[in-house]
Amino acid sequence: MIAPLSHRWRVWFALLLTLVLLGSAARAEDGYRLWLRYDPIADSALRQAYARSLTEIVMNEPPSRFGAATLAATRDELVRGLHGLLGTDVPVVAKATRDGALLVGTPENPDLLPLVSERDLRAASEEGYILRHVVVDGHPRVLLMANHNIGLLYGAFALLRELQLNHPIDHLDMVSAPRIQRRLLNHWDDLNRFVERGYAGRSLWEWFQLPDYVDPRYRDYGRANASLGINGTVLNNVNADPLILTSDYLRKVAAIANALRPYGMRVYLSVRFSAPVEVGDLTTADPFDPAVQRWWSAKADEIYRLIPDFGGFLVKANSEGQPGPQNYGRTHADGANMMADALVPHGGVVIWRAFVYDDKNHEDRAKQAYDEFKPLDGKFHSNVIIQVKNGPIDFMPREPFHPLFGAMPRTPLSLELQITQEYLGGSIHLAHLGPMWKEVLDSDTHADGPGSTVGRIVDGSLEHHGISMIAGVANIGTDRNWCGHPLDAANWYAFGRLAWDYTLGTDTIADEWTRMTFSNDPRVVRTITKMLLESREAVVNYEMPLGLHHIMASDHHYGPGPWVNDMKRADWNPTYYHRADAEGLGFDRTATGSNALAQYAPPVAKAWGDLATCPDTLLLWFHHVPWTYRMRSGRTMWDELCLHYQHGVDTVREWQKSWDALHGSIDDERWSHVKVLLARQEREARQWRDACTQYFQTFSKLPLPVGVEPPEHPLAYYEAIKLHYVPGSAEAK
């Protein structure tokens, strides 16, 4: 009896050790999987219910109708996801044999066509999908149907998301399609792999190894984007190197395009307007010159031979030193249309950025893009999209919506958002930007009466455009977790979800990401979701409250610098924007100042132009406000300003306590990383508070209000802080 017992204990010990090791491996998290964590569902009863509802994957699509690679990606995702979430293999079969079969296909499948209506198929459109619980001949099934292969892939991710979120699927009934056609990431990546305003390592694109070696991470990148419905990527910096258009580099671009194509992603390139001179041996880039026109046409032909589904060109022209058509006495429309003509035969588009301002123009910088582009409305060709930042300055923590939205009804406008945190603490500070983007998308321009939201302009529905686009400047790099801060991938996720459907609530998006990235533990979900949803406003409070803007340190844009007044351009100086003096604070953009308000529709201009009706959040953007002005709270503007700075600091401290309480509820690797980052964020929030309140106090001459902590150091201490090699800055190249 002793020997068998000993053997049995050895077996049990080995099994126990294996389980412990597996458990430890499962708990080790480096963030690489992002929100696509297909670990077994913790609720065993729910997991078993899902397993009964999803017993096999039925796929028998005619191969002629579909790109084989995308169909294979759909199958592989379902197999991988269901195996991981359910803890069992779910076979792929050609014909349903069990209850709970998952039926996957298109209208070409005669067995599936009767299960949906024409109305559903129209609603699904080109890229959407139908997910539905159905009964076929008395047998319960789950239907995943789409008009095209990419819709099947998007639908597969949507189904797996429902399981990750622990949603019931026994009454599943979902028809979903994107509201915006082109949903792009913009990478500000240089060919030397430096990422301008990047905080998560170097560029993903291994140009020196391409086209021979294609990093498997490109496919993981495509897969993550497909899970959100992002369908395009601009690979390189808007401050473009003309080498990207040489034949050698185009072959490298083609290799990346091949890796991303199965996931529905089209590749775009940022191009330099003067490329015909720099890599084309021409003496001019004048868009009216026939030789220049022929060069761009020939270059487009070359690109499309290599990349048949190439998306088009993104152009930054006549801005911040970049060349453009104005160098030759031409307009933005002249330059964009010349390039657009080269792309028309291939179905490509030109995306022309409206981020323009001129140091020789002494007009308010906030007005300059409107002044340049508004007169050109209706003069761009039909395959030109004007890409407009969310606000009129430059991705500040809070800006009013850009006045061009609603001002160019005959021109498609794309909304450009910044996912990377150039002005919100890089990848050090927690700043979830879903609420910021939702704020601008829901903003009512009143351009065509009430309800003329920025979202309806961007999706083309308000002005009846046949093309629509939204873009996000990526926060992605070679860091193992992709985005630097363990919670920053929530911004990538939020951008993708809002690009697909900007009517989604930010609380829903934050809840989804938290559950998929961490767990469905209610305490974990409540804590992290609350932190995410508070974070943008907290950063606004301790950096630039009440409509203050552009008061950060020079060049690297990290930390406070309201005192800076020595930049070579006036409109690069924080003092240009805050205009603090003995009387008050803020930029007067009313009729008595720069009159930038006149660029907005009358109802908006009227509301924002009156101190009594202007939102507190935009007060100092549009008004020079006396220090002793009484705010809605009853406090003076000075007291309100200082208390906002303090509140931002207090909020970060609350997060620290909340995060500490999660110890043991999430993996140690990510918990420890975030704990360290929150400590630094709290310290730097105090620096912002102390630097800004002391600096503005030199003008107000007023004491800090009760409730605001005294500064730790004198103002000179903060003015003397010099940071070097901040990631994403020119010095760090």
PLM regions and their residue ranges:
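Feature activates predominantly on carbohydrate-active enzymes
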Residues: 62-77, 81-83, 117-314, 344, ...
